[in-house]
């Protein structure tokens, strides 16, 4: 089975003085997270779409889904965790409460504040996760990447053609991700905050899927301005 996990656990501190968490801010008159949910509903192979949000915003999320007539039976809203990976584990636990997982079950995890993902990106994530077990969505690094050990001087300038910027979705065979996460020590869990990095550190393959430059993450007021420019430009979603 194929599951979607929409990660909406953040409060958006980098967005500044705003009345709502960033995922609920309006983008062309509609909450960002609603744009994202609509994109997931366009991909018809999902058996369940699980939205993980702070507990105090669960009822608000339900109200939004009702207001925008997205009260689809396959959508479920649960409480997120203390961090990204904890939120993903909460989603997996929610699935396990009513389904027995098998080795081929897949979860597509995605930032709620990336509303411009495409069907192609989702489709390739699912296809490659079925084949390789784990997938990360990336775009080529446009700028030269600088590494500094002390934030004062350059330590290294990696070869740009080998550098990529990570996006989401990140997609996994569920049992493999869960088993990998549970194998970590508490200190490792605190350091390895990216799910793909857990698998990489354990020596497991993570396949790359080409993202899109417009698949941006909306975390600052500037990002929101860029997102409004993208959406008014009628960027195609294939």
UniProtKB/Swiss-Prot annotation:
Major enzyme class: transferase
SUPFAM superfamilies tied to this protein: Nucleotide-diphospho-sugar transferases
Annotated organism of origin: Staphylococcus epidermidis (strain ATCC 35984 / DSM 28319 / BCRC 17069 / CCUG 31568 / BM 3577 / RP62A)
Similarity comment: Belongs to the IspD/TarI cytidylyltransferase family. TarI subfamily.
Name of the featured protein: Ribitol-5-phosphate cytidylyltransferase
EC number, as in UniProt: 2.7.7.40
Residue sites binding CTP per the record: 7-10, 81-87
Pathway it works in: Cell wall biogenesis; poly(ribitol phosphate) teichoic acid biosynthesis
